[in-house]
Amino acid sequence: MKGKWMAAIFLFLGAFVLLNFSSSQAQPIENELYLITPVSKDVHDPALKAFADYAKKKWNIDVKTSAIPKGTPVAYGQILEWKGKPQADIFWGGEGTLFDALAVEGLLEPVKISKAMWDEIPTTIGKPVGLPLKDPKGFWVGTTLEPYGLIYQPKLLKRLGVEIKDWDDLLNPKLKGQIAQCTPDRSSSSHASYEVMLQTYGWEKGWEWLKKLAANTGIFTARSRDVPNVVAKGEFAVGFAVPSYMAFAELVAGYDVMFVYPKNAYVTPEPMAVLKGAPHPKAAQAFIEFLLSEEGQKLFAELGLYPITPKYKVQGPPGSKQEKTVQFTGGMRSFFDMPVGNVYDEKIAGPKKRIEEVNSYFRKEIAEKHKEIVKGK
């Protein structure tokens, strides 16, 4: 009799375990999602909140979300150190070449979205050099288009008698001490913009131009986020290499600022990838799919960013954040409605050796000699 009772108990426990295992396997997504990202909380916080709301509505699952904020080089290094056992599910933001390098190391999972959604995203954007918007091998995909441009204070520029429309306007002597920028070894947006000048003019003439810019620079900030902030507060007239959403956040906060997208300025697709060994892979894949949906792309448009696909445009009712984005960037609704100039070649800028060369040259020839450059020595 005792044996029969024991057999019944084991049968019950086995069925219970199997039921729970099957239930967890059938669950559409996990209830947690973690990012490691250089993308500002002005963007990743609304994106995570919107996804959590979406998951609750679609699957009735409460998803706990969080982000590990790290600069691009630090985030990349951290992922390498994790060695396939990451403490985050997704890497979001930075240059596509870093994602390519992680894929080569076997540290990324293929992106799993519908073929129709994948095909809607163009392979590249820009001429004469096409900037990749997705990985041909499928390990990363762009999420939104974000220009690195110039933020300025209209009233302050008017007082100085200066107009800002393109890069060379920054070299006006009237802007002496009025420009803010972040060092290229601390900011991917600054580094990419330095590369734009180096690839436009060549190594020697490009550095000559950047030294002239340094002569008008009043501050090198420690973080790229600080550049639009000091301009918004009126401490400086112009900010160099500012991501559009960072500039737009200052406008939304009530500051009188404007944004210029100069010729051949770098446009990042804000790449996203699922990390190999991600603790919550289903939630990670669902997050990517959500951001590329109409709802996700509309969210970006409210934050000063642009759709990654020609299918959507920045538009909304009068007075909406979407229309403020359009006005803020000079009437632009889509990068696919206009010719986009791009000289940034990832094959040149991407290798680790090149990145170190640019950063090293900057530190030795500009950062260490900045006072002399300002004095014209």
Language model regions located:
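C-terminal capping/gating helix-and-loop segments adjacent to ligand/active sites or protein-protein/ligand interfaces
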Residues: 300-377
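Ligand-binding pocket segment of bilobal, Venus flytrap-like solute-binding proteins
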Residues: 186-261
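A bilobed periplasmic-binding-protein/Venus flytrap-type ligand-binding module shared by bacterial periplasmic
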Residues: 151-156, 268-283, 299-300, 308
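Periplasmic-binding protein-like
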Residues: 177-182, 290-312
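A structural signal for short loop-to-beta-strand junctions that line the ligand-binding cleft
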Residues: 86-91, 109-150, 168, 178
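Ligand-binding "clamshell"
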Residues: 102-111, 128-129, 135-137, 248-261
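Short beta-strand->loop
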Residues: 36-39, 134-145, 152-155, 159-160, ...
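Early extracytoplasmic/lumenal segment of secretory-pathway proteins
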Residues: 27-101, 228
